[in-house]
Amino acid sequence: MKVLVIIDVQNDFLINGSLEVPDGNDVIEPINEIIKNYALVVATKDWHPLDHVSFASNHQGKKIGDVVKVNNLDQILWPVHCVQESKGSDFPTTLNIKAINKIIYKGTNSQIDSYSGFNDNGKIRSTGLSDYLKTKNVTSIDYVG
């Protein structure tokens, strides 16, 4: 089975978001076009607690863009973004969320970041994505976002 994995298409990464990606909104329409070609669609969400280690505001004297060591890993400091249950963590209303079969939450541990949809940055804790894809007998993965 083939799966489409939508990576972190969330309000905080779009226009006027706290961690805006230039032209980030431009991915939404193409995703909505191709999503209908997949029987299985998974979306990842950055889903941070307010005390997350990646937020510059949680490191006294540090600013956005600084790099600090946390648990022997380099951590880039970001603005507060994709806080659990916030509008910034939501999918944009223009994304066809009805086609999403499963949401994988990442970055949920306040002490370690998770850039990957599969594991945290230290590869200590899985997000469950790999196990989920195995249960669905996935043989091919297409990524967008």
How should each PLM-predicted stretch be described?
Residues 9, 19-20, 65:
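Bulky hydrophobic/aromatic packing residues
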Residues 20-24, 58-61:
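Glycine-rich, phosphate-binding/catalytic loops in enzymes
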